[in-house]
Amino acid sequence: HDHSHHDHGDHSGYGTGRERIEVLEDIFAENDHCAAHNRDAFDAHNVQAINVMSSPGSGKTTVLQHVLAAAQAAGIRTGVIEGDIETSLDADRLGGYGAQISLLNTGNGFGGECHLDAPMVAVALSRLDLSALDLVFIENVGNLVCPAEFEVGEHRKLMVYAVTEGEDKPLKYPVMF
C-alpha cells in the first residue's frame, strides 16, 4: 500500500455523523466479579446452581414444579431463587416441594429489571442456608434478551422453550440459544 488516503471521514457505515467512542471498560466487570463470589459460595458448600431462563409464560415454573417433586422424592435438597418483577405467584407455586425459596422482586428496590444480575442473586443467597442444600435453581425473570447476558454465579444455564413461541426465536435471540 503505497499511497495516502486524504478522506479521514467516518466510514463505519452508520451514517449518523456522530463521533464513535471507544469503550475501554468492561461494563459487566462489577457484575462478573459478584458472580464469581456467588459461584465461590455455591462451591464452598458443594451446591450446584442452574440458571433457568425463558420467555414469560413458557413453562419455567411448571418445569421446576416437576423437577422439585422428583428431587424431593430422591432426597435431593433443593433451593430456588425466584425472580419476578412484581408478584410472589411463582414462589408460592413452588413452596410445596420441600425447597428453600428466596424471592427477588426486581420491581421492589432493584429498579424493575427484566433479568436477575449477580448482586441480586447475592441478596437472595444470603437468605438461603447453603449448607442444607445440594442444588439451587435460579428462576430468572421471563425474558429472552437480558438474562442470557448476565452471569449470576451459576454452573449451568437451562433454557425452557415453548414451540408455540415460533421457530424464529433462535434467529431473533441468538445469545439465549
Task: Tell me what each language-model feature is.
Residues 1-15:
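Long, basic/Gly/Ser/Thr-rich N-terminal segments
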Residues 14-40, 44-53, 58, 62, ...:
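Nucleotide-state-sensitive switch-loop elements of NTP-binding domains
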Residues 143-156, 160-177:
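Conserved C-terminal guanine-recognition region of P-loop GTPase G domains, centered on the G4
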